[in-house]
Amino acid sequence: MALLHSTLIWIVYAIVVGILSIVASTFVYIYQTPRDRSAAVTTVCIFTLTALLATVLLLPVDVALVSSTTSEFGRRKDWATDHEVEKITYSLTVVYYFLYSLDAVLCLLIVPFTYFWYEEYDEVAYEDDGRFTRKPFWGAFKYTLVFILLTIILFLVGFFVPVAKDRKGAHFDLDYFKRLLTENHGERALTFALGLLIVMGIIVYVIYSSTGLAFFPISFIKSSPSISSPMLSANIESRLEENIERQRQLEGRCGGNPDHLSSKDRRELDSLVREERTLRRRKRLAEASRGQGRNFVIKVWYKLGAVFRPIKLLGGLLLLAISVMIWISMLLTCIDKAKNSVCKQKCGYILGKINIINPVNWVLVEAASVFPADYVIFIVLVLHLFTSSVVGIATIGIRFLWIRLLQIRKGHTSPQALLLATVMLTLITLALNYSISMIVVPQYATYGPQTFCDYPSIPASAPLDCSKHKEYLKPCSELANNPAAKAVCTPSVASTFLNRITLNFPFFGIVDFWAQFVFLGFSLIVLLISLFRTPRFDEQQMDEDAEEAEEEGLLAASGSRFNAAWQDTTGRTRDQRVRFRDDE
Protein backbone atom coordinates (compact mmCIF):
# COMPACT_ATOMS: atom_id res chain seq x y z
CA MET A 1 0.00 0.00 0.00
CA ALA A 2 2.83 2.39 0.90
CA LEU A 3 4.67 1.55 -2.35
CA LEU A 4 1.52 2.11 -4.40
CA HIS A 5 0.89 5.46 -2.70
CA SER A 6 4.47 6.64 -3.31
CA THR A 7 4.34 5.50 -6.93
CA LEU A 8 1.13 7.44 -7.56
CA ILE A 9 2.70 10.57 -6.08
CA TRP A 10 5.71 10.29 -8.41
CA ILE A 11 3.41 9.63 -11.38
CA VAL A 12 1.52 12.85 -10.60
CA TYR A 13 4.87 14.67 -10.45
CA ALA A 14 5.89 13.26 -13.84
CA ILE A 15 2.60 14.46 -15.35
CA VAL A 16 3.16 17.91 -13.83
CA VAL A 17 6.68 18.08 -15.31
CA GLY A 18 5.18 17.27 -18.72
CA ILE A 19 2.68 20.10 -18.27
CA LEU A 20 5.53 22.40 -17.20
CA SER A 21 7.39 21.71 -20.44
CA ILE A 22 4.27 22.83 -22.32
CA VAL A 23 4.08 25.99 -20.18
CA ALA A 24 7.77 26.75 -20.81
CA SER A 25 7.37 26.11 -24.55
CA THR A 26 4.35 28.41 -24.68
CA PHE A 27 6.27 31.19 -22.94
CA VAL A 28 9.24 30.88 -25.30
CA TYR A 29 7.17 30.74 -28.50
CA ILE A 30 4.96 33.65 -27.45
CA TYR A 31 7.84 35.99 -26.70
CA GLN A 32 10.50 35.11 -29.28
CA THR A 33 10.58 36.88 -32.62
CA PRO A 34 9.75 34.62 -35.59
CA ARG A 35 12.36 36.31 -37.80
CA ASP A 36 15.39 35.39 -35.63
CA ARG A 37 14.17 32.10 -34.24
CA SER A 38 16.96 29.64 -33.34
CA ALA A 39 16.32 25.97 -32.59
CA ALA A 40 19.28 25.76 -30.18
CA VAL A 41 18.23 28.86 -28.23
CA THR A 42 14.62 27.69 -28.09
CA THR A 43 15.60 24.23 -26.83
CA VAL A 44 17.93 25.56 -24.13
CA CYS A 45 15.37 28.09 -22.88
CA ILE A 46 12.55 25.53 -22.74
CA PHE A 47 14.70 22.93 -20.99
CA THR A 48 16.05 25.45 -18.47
CA LEU A 49 12.64 26.82 -17.55
CA THR A 50 11.21 23.30 -17.26
CA ALA A 51 14.04 22.24 -14.92
CA LEU A 52 13.54 25.33 -12.76
CA LEU A 53 9.80 24.89 -12.39
CA ALA A 54 10.30 21.17 -11.76
CA THR A 55 12.60 22.07 -8.85
CA VAL A 56 10.05 24.36 -7.23
CA LEU A 57 7.13 22.01 -7.83
CA LEU A 58 8.93 19.09 -6.23
CA LEU A 59 7.96 20.55 -2.83
CA PRO A 60 4.37 19.15 -2.74
CA VAL A 61 5.78 15.72 -3.62
CA ASP A 62 8.28 16.11 -0.78
CA VAL A 63 5.53 17.10 1.65
CA ALA A 64 3.19 14.31 0.49
CA LEU A 65 5.85 11.61 0.85
CA VAL A 66 7.07 12.58 4.33
CA SER A 67 3.48 13.17 5.48
CA SER A 68 2.42 9.74 4.26
CA THR A 69 4.44 8.20 7.12
CA THR A 70 2.02 9.53 9.76
CA SER A 71 -1.65 8.89 10.40
CA GLU A 72 -4.38 11.43 11.04
CA PHE A 73 -4.23 10.56 14.76
CA GLY A 74 -0.64 11.73 15.22
CA ARG A 75 1.09 8.34 15.06
CA ARG A 76 3.59 6.75 12.72
CA LYS A 77 2.04 4.18 10.43
CA ASP A 78 3.01 0.58 10.99
CA TRP A 79 5.14 0.35 7.86
CA ALA A 80 6.92 3.70 8.53
CA THR A 81 9.98 2.40 10.35
CA ASP A 82 13.05 4.59 10.70
CA HIS A 83 14.64 2.68 7.83
CA GLU A 84 11.68 3.30 5.51
CA VAL A 85 11.51 6.99 6.40
CA GLU A 86 15.24 7.29 5.76
CA LYS A 87 14.80 5.67 2.34
CA ILE A 88 12.13 8.24 1.44
CA THR A 89 14.19 11.23 2.56
CA TYR A 90 17.31 9.85 0.85
CA SER A 91 15.54 9.44 -2.50
CA LEU A 92 14.16 12.97 -2.23
CA THR A 93 17.62 14.30 -1.32
CA VAL A 94 19.12 12.68 -4.43
CA VAL A 95 16.43 14.22 -6.65
CA TYR A 96 16.87 17.66 -5.04
CA TYR A 97 20.66 17.58 -5.38
CA PHE A 98 20.34 16.53 -9.01
CA LEU A 99 17.85 19.31 -9.83
CA TYR A 100 19.74 22.00 -7.91
CA SER A 101 23.02 20.98 -9.56
CA LEU A 102 21.31 20.98 -12.96
CA ASP A 103 19.90 24.46 -12.31
CA ALA A 104 23.35 25.76 -11.34
CA VAL A 105 25.02 24.23 -14.43
CA LEU A 106 22.32 25.60 -16.73
CA CYS A 107 22.53 29.08 -15.22
CA LEU A 108 26.33 29.31 -15.01
CA LEU A 109 27.46 27.31 -18.05
CA ILE A 110 24.89 26.12 -20.59
CA VAL A 111 22.91 29.34 -21.07
CA PRO A 112 26.06 31.56 -21.28
CA PHE A 113 27.60 29.13 -23.80
CA THR A 114 24.43 29.23 -25.90
CA TYR A 115 24.44 33.04 -25.78
CA PHE A 116 28.03 33.30 -27.01
CA TRP A 117 27.47 30.54 -29.55
CA TYR A 118 24.51 32.41 -31.04
CA GLU A 119 26.54 35.63 -31.18
CA GLU A 120 29.34 33.85 -33.06
CA TYR A 121 26.97 31.81 -35.20
CA ASP A 122 24.99 34.92 -36.09
CA GLU A 123 28.15 36.46 -37.53
CA VAL A 124 29.44 33.37 -39.31
CA ALA A 125 26.17 31.53 -40.08
CA TYR A 126 26.77 29.11 -42.91
CA GLU A 127 29.59 28.78 -45.39
CA ASP A 128 28.68 29.22 -48.98
CA ASP A 129 28.19 25.48 -49.41
CA GLY A 130 25.69 25.38 -46.56
CA ARG A 131 27.85 23.38 -44.10
CA PHE A 132 28.54 24.31 -40.48
CA THR A 133 31.84 25.79 -39.36
CA ARG A 134 33.58 25.06 -36.08
CA LYS A 135 34.38 28.69 -35.41
CA PRO A 136 31.15 29.49 -33.48
CA PHE A 137 31.72 26.61 -31.06
CA TRP A 138 35.34 27.47 -30.36
CA GLY A 139 34.51 31.16 -30.00
CA ALA A 140 31.66 30.41 -27.60
CA PHE A 141 33.82 27.99 -25.61
CA LYS A 142 36.54 30.63 -25.31
CA TYR A 143 34.15 33.13 -23.74
CA THR A 144 32.49 30.46 -21.59
CA LEU A 145 35.87 29.59 -20.03
CA VAL A 146 35.40 32.67 -17.84
CA PHE A 147 32.14 31.25 -16.47
CA ILE A 148 33.72 27.81 -16.02
CA LEU A 149 36.49 29.43 -13.98
CA LEU A 150 33.95 31.37 -11.91
CA THR A 151 31.96 28.17 -11.27
CA ILE A 152 35.08 26.31 -10.12
CA ILE A 153 36.06 29.20 -7.84
CA LEU A 154 32.52 29.36 -6.45
CA PHE A 155 32.51 25.68 -5.50
CA LEU A 156 36.06 25.82 -4.13
CA VAL A 157 35.12 28.75 -1.91
CA GLY A 158 32.08 26.83 -0.73
CA PHE A 159 34.26 23.77 -0.11
CA PHE A 160 36.65 25.59 2.23
CA VAL A 161 34.61 28.52 3.57
CA PRO A 162 33.99 28.22 7.31
CA VAL A 163 30.41 27.75 8.42
CA ALA A 164 28.78 29.62 11.30
CA LYS A 165 31.04 29.29 14.33
CA ASP A 166 28.72 30.87 16.88
CA ARG A 167 27.10 27.58 17.87
CA LYS A 168 26.47 28.44 21.46
CA GLY A 169 22.93 28.96 22.62
CA ALA A 170 19.80 27.07 23.43
CA HIS A 171 18.74 26.83 19.79
CA PHE A 172 21.81 24.78 18.87
CA ASP A 173 20.96 22.20 21.54
CA LEU A 174 17.85 21.17 19.61
CA ASP A 175 18.16 18.01 17.54
CA TYR A 176 16.63 19.73 14.51
CA PHE A 177 19.33 22.41 14.41
CA LYS A 178 22.09 19.87 15.06
CA ARG A 179 21.01 18.00 11.94
CA LEU A 180 21.20 21.19 9.90
CA LEU A 181 24.86 21.87 10.68
CA THR A 182 26.80 20.71 7.65
CA GLU A 183 30.00 18.76 8.20
CA ASN A 184 30.31 17.21 4.72
CA HIS A 185 32.50 19.41 2.49
CA GLY A 186 30.71 18.40 -0.72
CA GLU A 187 27.32 19.36 0.71
CA ARG A 188 28.85 22.55 2.05
CA ALA A 189 30.12 23.53 -1.42
CA LEU A 190 26.71 22.98 -3.02
CA THR A 191 24.99 24.72 -0.09
CA PHE A 192 27.24 27.77 -0.41
CA ALA A 193 26.89 27.94 -4.21
CA LEU A 194 23.10 27.76 -4.10
CA GLY A 195 22.95 30.16 -1.18
CA LEU A 196 24.91 32.71 -3.20
CA LEU A 197 22.73 32.15 -6.28
CA ILE A 198 19.60 32.60 -4.14
CA VAL A 199 20.96 35.91 -2.79
CA MET A 200 21.66 37.06 -6.35
CA GLY A 201 18.19 35.93 -7.34
CA ILE A 202 16.64 37.78 -4.40
CA ILE A 203 17.94 41.06 -5.84
CA VAL A 204 16.34 40.37 -9.23
CA TYR A 205 13.24 38.99 -7.52
CA VAL A 206 12.75 42.14 -5.44
CA ILE A 207 12.93 44.38 -8.50
CA TYR A 208 11.03 42.41 -11.11
CA SER A 209 8.74 39.99 -9.27
CA SER A 210 7.43 42.68 -6.93
CA THR A 211 6.57 44.84 -9.94
CA GLY A 212 4.92 41.94 -11.74
CA LEU A 213 2.94 40.80 -8.69
CA ALA A 214 1.18 44.17 -8.63
CA PHE A 215 1.10 44.94 -12.35
CA PHE A 216 0.03 41.51 -13.65
CA PRO A 217 -3.59 41.63 -12.38
CA ILE A 218 -3.90 45.36 -13.09
CA SER A 219 -2.94 44.73 -16.74
CA PHE A 220 -6.06 42.55 -17.03
CA ILE A 221 -8.32 45.03 -15.27
CA LYS A 222 -7.04 48.19 -16.97
CA SER A 223 -5.90 47.10 -20.42
CA SER A 224 -4.23 49.71 -22.59
CA PRO A 225 -6.19 50.75 -25.69
CA SER A 226 -5.81 48.40 -28.64
CA ILE A 227 -4.93 49.61 -32.11
CA SER A 228 -7.91 47.65 -33.39
CA SER A 229 -10.37 49.68 -31.34
CA PRO A 230 -12.85 51.63 -33.50
CA MET A 231 -11.89 54.98 -31.96
CA LEU A 232 -8.19 54.65 -32.76
CA SER A 233 -8.90 53.29 -36.23
CA ALA A 234 -11.21 56.20 -36.95
CA ASN A 235 -8.59 58.61 -35.63
CA ILE A 236 -5.97 57.16 -37.97
CA GLU A 237 -8.34 57.42 -40.94
CA SER A 238 -9.21 61.02 -40.08
CA ARG A 239 -5.56 62.05 -39.73
CA LEU A 240 -4.71 60.36 -43.02
CA GLU A 241 -7.46 62.26 -44.85
CA GLU A 242 -6.28 65.57 -43.36
CA ASN A 243 -2.72 64.76 -44.36
CA ILE A 244 -3.63 63.98 -47.97
CA GLU A 245 -5.79 67.11 -48.22
CA ARG A 246 -2.92 69.29 -46.94
CA GLN A 247 -0.53 67.70 -49.46
CA ARG A 248 -2.98 68.52 -52.26
CA GLN A 249 -3.10 72.13 -51.14
CA LEU A 250 0.69 72.43 -51.18
CA GLU A 251 0.99 70.66 -54.54
CA GLY A 252 -1.73 72.95 -55.93
CA ARG A 253 0.35 76.00 -55.03
CA CYS A 254 3.35 74.81 -57.01
CA GLY A 255 1.52 73.22 -59.92
CA GLY A 256 3.03 69.83 -59.17
CA ASN A 257 6.63 71.11 -59.04
CA PRO A 258 7.95 71.17 -55.43
CA ASP A 259 10.89 73.37 -56.48
CA HIS A 260 8.50 76.32 -56.78
CA LEU A 261 7.63 76.06 -53.08
CA SER A 262 9.36 78.04 -50.38
CA SER A 263 11.83 76.22 -48.13
CA LYS A 264 9.29 76.23 -45.30
CA ASP A 265 6.57 74.67 -47.48
CA ARG A 266 9.03 72.06 -48.86
CA ARG A 267 9.94 71.02 -45.33
CA GLU A 268 6.24 70.78 -44.47
CA LEU A 269 5.56 68.69 -47.59
CA ASP A 270 8.41 66.31 -46.76
CA SER A 271 7.09 65.99 -43.23
CA LEU A 272 3.59 65.26 -44.54
CA VAL A 273 4.93 62.55 -46.87
CA ARG A 274 6.72 60.84 -43.97
CA GLU A 275 3.64 61.16 -41.79
CA GLU A 276 1.46 59.66 -44.55
CA ARG A 277 3.79 56.66 -44.77
CA THR A 278 3.55 56.19 -41.01
CA LEU A 279 -0.24 56.53 -40.97
CA ARG A 280 -0.64 54.01 -43.78
CA ARG A 281 1.52 51.56 -41.82
CA ARG A 282 -0.72 52.08 -38.79
CA LYS A 283 -3.80 51.58 -40.93
CA ARG A 284 -2.50 48.27 -42.29
CA LEU A 285 -1.58 47.16 -38.77
CA ALA A 286 -5.05 48.11 -37.48
CA GLU A 287 -6.73 46.20 -40.30
CA ALA A 288 -4.57 43.15 -39.62
CA SER A 289 -5.33 43.31 -35.90
CA ARG A 290 -9.07 43.29 -36.69
CA GLY A 291 -8.64 40.30 -38.98
CA GLN A 292 -9.47 42.15 -42.20
CA GLY A 293 -8.30 40.24 -45.21
CA ARG A 294 -7.87 37.08 -43.13
CA ASN A 295 -9.84 33.85 -43.22
CA PHE A 296 -13.12 33.27 -41.43
CA VAL A 297 -11.57 31.49 -38.44
CA ILE A 298 -9.26 34.41 -37.65
CA LYS A 299 -12.14 36.87 -37.87
CA VAL A 300 -14.24 34.74 -35.53
CA TRP A 301 -11.32 34.58 -33.09
CA TYR A 302 -11.06 38.38 -32.94
CA LYS A 303 -14.82 38.68 -32.49
CA LEU A 304 -14.75 36.19 -29.60
CA GLY A 305 -11.93 38.17 -28.02
CA ALA A 306 -14.11 41.27 -28.03
CA VAL A 307 -17.15 39.38 -26.69
CA PHE A 308 -15.27 37.78 -23.79
CA ARG A 309 -13.49 40.97 -22.74
CA PRO A 310 -15.63 41.22 -19.54
CA ILE A 311 -14.34 37.77 -18.54
CA LYS A 312 -10.84 39.19 -18.78
CA LEU A 313 -11.88 41.84 -16.26
CA LEU A 314 -13.19 39.17 -13.89
CA GLY A 315 -9.97 37.22 -14.35
CA GLY A 316 -8.00 40.32 -13.44
CA LEU A 317 -10.01 40.74 -10.24
CA LEU A 318 -9.35 37.09 -9.35
CA LEU A 319 -5.62 37.52 -9.98
CA LEU A 320 -5.64 40.68 -7.87
CA ALA A 321 -7.25 38.74 -5.01
CA ILE A 322 -4.54 36.07 -5.28
CA SER A 323 -1.80 38.71 -5.28
CA VAL A 324 -3.27 40.45 -2.23
CA MET A 325 -3.58 37.11 -0.42
CA ILE A 326 0.07 36.30 -1.14
CA TRP A 327 1.13 39.78 -0.03
CA ILE A 328 -0.75 39.49 3.27
CA SER A 329 0.64 36.01 3.92
CA MET A 330 4.19 37.18 3.32
CA LEU A 331 3.74 40.17 5.61
CA LEU A 332 2.34 38.05 8.45
CA THR A 333 5.16 35.50 8.23
CA CYS A 334 7.82 38.22 8.06
CA ILE A 335 6.42 39.81 11.21
CA ASP A 336 6.31 36.39 12.88
CA LYS A 337 9.94 35.68 11.95
CA ALA A 338 11.18 39.09 13.06
CA LYS A 339 9.40 38.81 16.39
CA ASN A 340 9.55 35.09 17.26
CA SER A 341 12.60 33.61 15.55
CA VAL A 342 14.48 31.44 18.05
CA CYS A 343 17.89 32.77 17.07
CA LYS A 344 17.22 35.90 14.98
CA GLN A 345 20.20 36.87 12.78
CA LYS A 346 22.47 34.13 14.19
CA CYS A 347 20.66 31.50 12.13
CA GLY A 348 19.10 33.59 9.36
CA TYR A 349 15.73 34.06 11.12
CA ILE A 350 14.67 30.42 11.16
CA LEU A 351 11.16 30.18 12.58
CA GLY A 352 10.86 27.26 14.98
CA LYS A 353 7.09 27.48 15.38
CA ILE A 354 4.28 29.25 13.54
CA ASN A 355 2.75 31.85 15.86
CA ILE A 356 0.78 33.93 13.33
CA ILE A 357 -1.43 32.04 10.90
CA ASN A 358 -1.35 33.28 7.32
CA PRO A 359 -4.19 32.42 4.91
CA VAL A 360 -2.23 30.76 2.07
CA ASN A 361 -0.33 28.52 4.49
CA TRP A 362 -3.58 27.51 6.23
CA VAL A 363 -5.31 26.62 2.95
CA LEU A 364 -2.42 24.45 1.77
CA VAL A 365 -2.05 22.65 5.11
CA GLU A 366 -5.76 21.83 5.13
CA ALA A 367 -5.70 20.72 1.49
CA ALA A 368 -2.58 18.57 2.01
CA SER A 369 -4.63 15.89 3.71
CA VAL A 370 -6.25 15.14 0.32
CA PHE A 371 -3.42 14.84 -2.21
CA PRO A 372 -3.30 16.17 -4.95
CA ALA A 373 -5.64 19.01 -3.90
CA ASP A 374 -2.70 20.86 -2.34
CA TYR A 375 -0.65 20.21 -5.49
CA VAL A 376 -3.23 21.98 -7.67
CA ILE A 377 -3.29 25.01 -5.34
CA PHE A 378 0.51 25.03 -5.16
CA ILE A 379 0.81 24.94 -8.96
CA VAL A 380 -1.52 27.95 -9.20
CA LEU A 381 0.59 29.76 -6.60
CA VAL A 382 3.90 29.02 -8.36
CA LEU A 383 2.64 29.83 -11.85
CA HIS A 384 1.10 33.07 -10.59
CA LEU A 385 4.43 34.19 -9.11
CA PHE A 386 6.37 32.95 -12.15
CA THR A 387 4.06 34.74 -14.59
CA SER A 388 4.26 37.86 -12.45
CA SER A 389 8.04 37.70 -12.76
CA VAL A 390 7.76 37.42 -16.55
CA VAL A 391 5.40 40.41 -16.62
CA GLY A 392 7.84 42.35 -14.43
CA ILE A 393 10.73 41.62 -16.80
CA ALA A 394 8.59 42.57 -19.81
CA THR A 395 7.46 45.81 -18.13
CA ILE A 396 10.85 47.01 -16.90
CA GLY A 397 13.05 45.38 -19.54
CA ILE A 398 16.63 44.24 -19.15
CA ARG A 399 18.44 47.28 -17.81
CA PHE A 400 21.79 48.42 -16.54
CA LEU A 401 20.91 51.03 -13.93
CA TRP A 402 18.42 53.27 -15.78
CA ILE A 403 19.56 52.31 -19.31
CA ARG A 404 17.37 49.78 -21.09
CA LEU A 405 19.62 47.30 -22.88
CA LEU A 406 17.09 44.81 -24.22
CA GLN A 407 13.32 44.61 -24.36
CA ILE A 408 11.10 41.60 -23.70
CA ARG A 409 7.93 41.80 -25.79
CA LYS A 410 5.50 39.28 -27.21
CA GLY A 411 6.66 38.24 -30.65
CA HIS A 412 9.56 40.73 -30.67
CA THR A 413 12.16 39.26 -28.29
CA SER A 414 15.56 38.55 -29.82
CA PRO A 415 17.37 35.29 -28.98
CA GLN A 416 19.95 37.21 -26.94
CA ALA A 417 17.25 38.90 -24.88
CA LEU A 418 15.44 35.58 -24.46
CA LEU A 419 18.58 33.91 -23.09
CA LEU A 420 19.27 36.78 -20.69
CA ALA A 421 15.65 36.67 -19.56
CA THR A 422 16.06 32.93 -18.96
CA VAL A 423 19.08 33.58 -16.72
CA MET A 424 17.08 36.19 -14.81
CA LEU A 425 14.16 33.78 -14.44
CA THR A 426 16.60 31.13 -13.22
CA LEU A 427 17.79 33.38 -10.42
CA ILE A 428 14.23 34.53 -9.69
CA THR A 429 12.98 30.94 -9.48
CA LEU A 430 15.72 30.02 -7.00
CA ALA A 431 14.67 33.03 -4.94
CA LEU A 432 11.02 31.99 -5.30
CA ASN A 433 11.96 28.59 -3.93
CA TYR A 434 13.15 30.28 -0.74
CA SER A 435 10.30 32.80 -0.52
CA ILE A 436 7.53 30.26 -1.06
CA SER A 437 8.97 27.66 1.32
CA MET A 438 10.15 29.98 4.09
CA ILE A 439 7.83 32.99 3.82
CA VAL A 440 4.57 32.23 2.01
CA VAL A 441 3.85 28.69 3.29
CA PRO A 442 6.40 27.89 6.04
CA GLN A 443 4.34 25.31 7.96
CA TYR A 444 3.19 23.52 4.81
CA ALA A 445 6.70 23.48 3.34
CA THR A 446 8.27 22.10 6.54
CA TYR A 447 5.86 19.53 7.96
CA GLY A 448 2.74 19.76 5.83
CA PRO A 449 -0.32 18.33 7.62
CA GLN A 450 1.75 16.23 10.07
CA THR A 451 0.55 16.24 13.68
CA PHE A 452 1.61 14.48 16.86
CA CYS A 453 -0.37 13.32 19.88
CA ASP A 454 0.33 15.41 22.97
CA TYR A 455 -1.96 13.32 25.17
CA PRO A 456 -0.29 11.91 28.34
CA SER A 457 -0.26 8.13 28.01
CA ILE A 458 -0.40 5.69 30.94
CA PRO A 459 1.92 3.90 31.22
CA ALA A 460 4.57 6.14 29.74
CA SER A 461 5.94 3.36 27.51
CA ALA A 462 2.59 2.83 25.80
CA PRO A 463 2.14 4.33 22.31
CA LEU A 464 0.30 7.62 22.20
CA ASP A 465 -3.16 7.43 20.70
CA CYS A 466 -5.36 10.47 20.04
CA SER A 467 -8.08 8.66 18.11
CA LYS A 468 -10.48 9.47 20.95
CA HIS A 469 -8.81 12.70 22.05
CA LYS A 470 -8.38 14.75 18.89
CA GLU A 471 -8.17 17.93 20.93
CA TYR A 472 -4.64 16.86 21.90
CA LEU A 473 -3.45 16.71 18.29
CA LYS A 474 -0.87 19.44 17.66
CA PRO A 475 0.90 20.45 14.45
CA CYS A 476 4.53 19.41 14.23
CA SER A 477 7.18 22.05 14.84
CA GLU A 478 10.90 22.25 15.50
CA LEU A 479 10.34 23.50 19.06
CA ALA A 480 7.99 20.74 20.21
CA ASN A 481 9.27 19.45 23.58
CA ASN A 482 7.23 16.25 23.63
CA PRO A 483 9.37 13.18 22.72
CA ALA A 484 6.44 11.99 20.62
CA ALA A 485 7.04 14.85 18.20
CA LYS A 486 10.62 13.72 17.60
CA ALA A 487 9.44 10.16 17.02
CA VAL A 488 6.62 11.08 14.65
CA CYS A 489 7.43 14.34 12.83
CA THR A 490 9.65 14.29 9.72
CA PRO A 491 10.62 17.64 8.16
CA SER A 492 10.60 17.95 4.38
CA VAL A 493 13.90 17.68 2.54
CA ALA A 494 13.38 21.09 0.90
CA SER A 495 12.95 22.93 4.20
CA THR A 496 15.94 21.09 5.66
CA PHE A 497 18.12 22.15 2.74
CA LEU A 498 17.01 25.80 2.80
CA ASN A 499 17.34 26.05 6.58
CA ARG A 500 20.80 24.50 6.29
CA ILE A 501 21.83 27.37 4.01
CA THR A 502 20.65 30.05 6.43
CA LEU A 503 22.03 28.29 9.52
CA ASN A 504 25.48 27.54 8.12
CA PHE A 505 25.78 30.90 6.33
CA PRO A 506 23.66 33.36 8.36
CA PHE A 507 24.54 36.29 6.08
CA PHE A 508 22.56 34.68 3.27
CA GLY A 509 19.58 34.20 5.58
CA ILE A 510 19.71 37.81 6.78
CA VAL A 511 19.75 39.18 3.23
CA ASP A 512 17.01 36.80 2.05
CA PHE A 513 14.77 37.65 5.00
CA TRP A 514 15.01 41.44 5.04
CA ALA A 515 14.70 41.58 1.26
CA GLN A 516 11.14 40.33 1.69
CA PHE A 517 10.16 43.64 3.34
CA VAL A 518 11.66 45.52 0.38
CA PHE A 519 9.67 43.24 -1.93
CA LEU A 520 6.45 44.02 -0.08
CA GLY A 521 7.16 47.75 -0.18
CA PHE A 522 7.94 47.79 -3.91
CA SER A 523 4.84 45.77 -4.81
CA LEU A 524 2.61 48.06 -2.74
CA ILE A 525 4.02 51.18 -4.42
CA VAL A 526 3.58 49.70 -7.91
CA LEU A 527 0.02 48.62 -7.08
CA LEU A 528 -0.97 52.10 -5.92
CA ILE A 529 0.61 53.74 -8.96
CA SER A 530 -1.07 51.26 -11.33
CA LEU A 531 -4.49 51.80 -9.75
CA PHE A 532 -4.43 55.57 -10.28
CA ARG A 533 -2.54 55.69 -13.57
CA THR A 534 -4.44 55.55 -16.86
CA PRO A 535 -2.92 53.16 -19.44
CA ARG A 536 -1.65 54.95 -22.51
CA PHE A 537 -1.36 53.86 -26.10
CA ASP A 538 2.28 53.66 -27.23
CA GLU A 539 2.26 55.11 -30.75
CA GLN A 540 6.05 54.93 -31.06
CA GLN A 541 6.02 51.21 -30.34
CA MET A 542 3.20 50.73 -32.82
CA ASP A 543 5.19 52.54 -35.51
CA GLU A 544 8.21 50.35 -34.82
CA ASP A 545 6.06 47.21 -35.08
CA ALA A 546 4.52 48.39 -38.33
CA GLU A 547 7.92 49.28 -39.78
CA GLU A 548 9.33 45.91 -38.74
CA ALA A 549 6.38 44.09 -40.31
CA GLU A 550 6.86 46.07 -43.51
CA GLU A 551 10.58 45.26 -43.57
CA GLU A 552 9.87 41.57 -43.10
CA GLY A 553 7.41 41.67 -45.97
CA LEU A 554 9.91 43.45 -48.22
CA LEU A 555 12.69 41.04 -47.27
CA ALA A 556 10.48 38.06 -47.98
CA ALA A 557 9.43 39.50 -51.34
CA SER A 558 13.03 40.42 -52.23
CA GLY A 559 14.24 36.95 -51.27
CA SER A 560 11.58 35.31 -53.42
CA ARG A 561 12.42 37.53 -56.41
CA PHE A 562 16.16 36.88 -55.97
CA ASN A 563 15.70 33.11 -55.75
CA ALA A 564 13.47 33.13 -58.82
CA ALA A 565 16.00 35.20 -60.79
CA TRP A 566 18.87 32.94 -59.72
CA GLN A 567 16.97 29.80 -60.69
CA ASP A 568 16.14 31.33 -64.08
CA THR A 569 19.84 32.13 -64.62
CA THR A 570 21.35 28.81 -63.48
CA GLY A 571 18.53 26.55 -64.55
CA ARG A 572 18.48 24.67 -61.23
CA THR A 573 17.41 25.24 -57.66
CA ARG A 574 19.74 25.80 -54.74
CA ASP A 575 19.14 22.24 -53.47
CA GLN A 576 20.24 20.87 -56.83
CA ARG A 577 23.37 23.07 -56.68
CA VAL A 578 24.28 21.76 -53.23
CA ARG A 579 23.80 18.13 -54.33
CA PHE A 580 25.99 18.82 -57.38
CA ARG A 581 28.79 20.09 -55.10
CA ASP A 582 28.47 17.05 -52.87
CA ASP A 583 28.77 14.75 -55.89
CA GLU A 584 31.97 16.54 -56.85
Swiss-Prot record:
Recorded GO MF terms: cobalamin binding
Superkingdom, natural source: Eukaryota
Cellular location(s): Lysosome membrane
Main location: membrane
Keywords of the record: Cobalamin, Cobalt, Lysosome, Membrane, Transmembrane, Transmembrane helix, Transport
Family per similarity comment: Belongs to the LIMR family. LMBRD1 subfamily.
Function noted in UniProt: Probable lysosomal cobalamin transporter. Required to export cobalamin from lysosomes allowing its conversion to cofactors.
The protein, known as: Probable lysosomal cobalamin transporter
